Regions:
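Extracytoplasmic
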Residues: 1-12, 17-27
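Structured loop/turn residues at beta-strand edges in well-structured enzyme cores
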Residues: 2, 37-38
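Short beta->alpha connector loops
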Residues: 13, 32-33, 48-49
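Short loop/helix-cap segments at secondary-structure boundaries that form the rim of catalytic
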Residues: 15-22, 36-37, 53-57
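Short acidic low-complexity segments
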Residues: 28-37
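Aromatic/acidic, Gly/Pro-rich catalytic loop(s) in extracytoplasmic/lumenal soluble domains
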Residues: 40-224
Length: 224
């Protein structure tokens, strides 16, 4: 998740996150003084948190898993908070998907974007993060863009969670193609939130990888 996100967690997990360098000001410690995870962006659902909130964790506070680690009692789910309740969140998620389908379709039809196969299908299906969609459109305004793959580094994410990373390939060998990738990277590095990525880097001279932090924002593209 982004360093700016507010993370709700049980006292033991919050202590671990703080020891790993996560700012204490961004941690919402669940317990007697904090009755619920509302006010945070994500909740770290350890066994203690699941036991505390039971079915309300999914049905009321945080319906979508954006990452999951481990199994059984040791499983840890990272869940996106629904600040206005599950029904409102699911409606916003459905509307956002419709907007992503529309924006993805525009990219597929853009003559300055080269994309085929699985990556093309992801765009058409609305499976791509809105920040990536807007970033790719901005890049295509400047030059031709070859998309080779979209990905999501988070294990165990719900199927409704958008893909938050993209790999852009050089258009050919040589210094000119590498310069084109570096030009894209410079534009991406100049972005401010919410369009500043978690990481963006060149893979040698042949590709550029961009990844955005979870959770993906809703409503960024406007209504369908």
């Amino acid at each position: 998740v982004a360093a700016s996100a507010i993370v709700a967690c049980d006292p033991a997990m919050c202590a671990v996150l703080h020891a790993d360098g996560f700012p204490s000001t961004r941690l919402l410690v669940l317990g007697t003084a904090t009755a619920d995870p509302l006010g945070s962006d994500v909740v770290v659902a350890t066994l203690a948190v699941r036991n505390e909130f039971g079915t309300r964790l999914q049905s009321v506070y945080a319906p979508v898993v954006i990452a999951s680690f481990g199994t059984g009692a040791g499983r840890i789910d990272i869940r996106a908070i629904a600040p206005d309740g599950t029904a409102a969140y699911e409606a916003a998620l459905a509307a956002d998907r419709r907007s992503r389908i529309s924006a993805g379709g525009q990219l597929v039809r853009n003559p300055r974007i080269i994309v085929t196969g699985v990556a093309r299908n992801a765009l058409s299906a609305g499976d791509v993060d809105p920040r990536l969609l807007m970033m790719l459109a901005a890049l295509a305004d400047q030059q031709q863009v070859r998309i080779t793959a979209f990905g999501d580094p988070s294990p165990g994410a719900s199927s409704v969670v958008p893909l938050r990373s993209v790999q852009i390939a050089a258009l050919g060998p040589g210094a000119e193609a590498e310069a084109s990738l570096r030009s894209m990277l410079s534009l991406i590095d100049a972005q401010r939130q919410p369009f500043q990525p978690l990481r963006a880097a060149l893979a040698g001279s042949s590709a550029l990888t961009v990844e955005y932090a979870a959770p993906s924002p809703l409503g960024l593209l406007g209504g369908p």
